């Protein structure tokens, strides 16, 4: 039995055309949830999306691990001549 609360984090995705994906995140992005966020971000890039819009209007907290995921995603997109927009 685990008495620790599960971190709250969720992401929904919406594709806009062939190259753009909106990732609408909610909750907290930290060391416990960053791997799930990284997985979704990397999947979008692997799917050939070169324009990512990250809607963080419902993100309550982000730590340095989450910021690292953002920077790594930005680097990958930049190498592909893509862009990342944070809302």
Regions found by a protein language model. Give the residues of each.
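Amphipathic alpha-helical interaction surfaces in cytosolic regulatory modules
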Residues: 28-87
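STAS-typified acidic loop motif
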Residues: 4-39, 56-58
